[in-house]
């Protein structure tokens, strides 16, 4: 797109799935860690963030298209909206039940992306992880929620296996698309012969894949963030990001 600055035009998802018992649009942040580009070596973390808008969804029109709290799920935008706390109240009041208890970290794995993954078969590496502190699946200080807790609620997805297959297929296709260019740049900095001789990982990159689910449970890749925030702004951030970093360095210690 020509203009005063580079821009990308995306088709707006006109039938977004709305969060649980609320009328809020949301997205899903999935973390992917790339350790090598030749051969392509990457992992998907199977815990993530559900990030909600803080105003009820409305189909875009001339009047509301400039109201970010309706259409943009970015967590940096929505905490500034004073109505954000209502999501947490609506979530906990559904069927007069409390939020889903926090999951145990020993069940979390990083899933390896390899040729089998592209064909729909997943391989995983179990790593040692400590139990998290008593953190609920809902953070009342923000519009963030645990992905696994959302997946466990009936009706949110047709099946978790189908959900993760969509994620894996999208991540694999994205990484394969950028692999030739990234491999060239990577090999310029770290010659392949040197890497094989020393058998070490020279670098890694954490990516944030953001998906918008629609009303038919199809995942749409919104963007890939090459520098996702690892700030620990909320309790949910502590619960997700600290084990993620622990897993990354555990894998690095094995390479």
Question: Residue ranges of each PLM-predicted region?
Answer:
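Catalytic core of tubulin tyrosine ligase-like
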Residues: 1-206, 215-216, 234, 238-254
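A short beta-strand motif that forms the metal-chelation/ATP-contact edge
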Residues: 211-213, 219-226
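Glycine-rich phosphate/pyrophosphate-binding beta-alpha loops
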Residues: 225-233
């Amino acid at each position: 797109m020509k203009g005063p600055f580079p821009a990308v035009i995306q088709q707006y998802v006109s039938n977004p799935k709305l969060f649980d018992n609320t009328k809020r649009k949301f997205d899903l942040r999935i973390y992917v860690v790339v350790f090598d580009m030749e051969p392509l070596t990457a992992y998907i973390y199977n815990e993530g963030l559900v990030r909600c808008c803080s105003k009820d969804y409305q189909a875009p029109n001339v009047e509301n298209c400039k109201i970010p709290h309706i259409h943009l799920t970015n967590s940096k935008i929505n905490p500034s909206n004073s109505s954000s706390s209502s999501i947490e109240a609506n979530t906990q009041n559904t069927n007069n039940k409390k939020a889903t208890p926090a999951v145990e970290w020993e069940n979390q794995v990083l899933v390896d992306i390899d040729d089998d993954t592209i064909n729909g078969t997943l391989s995983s590496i179990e790593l040692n992880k400590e139990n998290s502190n008593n953190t609920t699946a809902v953070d009342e200080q923000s519009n963030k929620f645990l992905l696994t807790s959302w997946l466990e609620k009936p009706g949110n997805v047709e099946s978790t296996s189908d959900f993760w297959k969509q994620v894996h297929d999208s991540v694999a296709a994205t990484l394969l698309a950028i692999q030739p260019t990234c491999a060239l740049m990577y090999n310029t900095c770290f010659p392949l012969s040197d890497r094989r001789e020393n058998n070490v990982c020279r670098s890694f990159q954490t990516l944030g894949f953001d998906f918008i689910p629609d009303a038919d449970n199809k995942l749409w890749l919104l963007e890939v963030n090459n520098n996702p925030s690892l700030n620990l702004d909320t309790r949910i951030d502590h619960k997700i990001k600290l084990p993620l970093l622990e897993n990354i360095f555990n894998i690095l210690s094995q390479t």
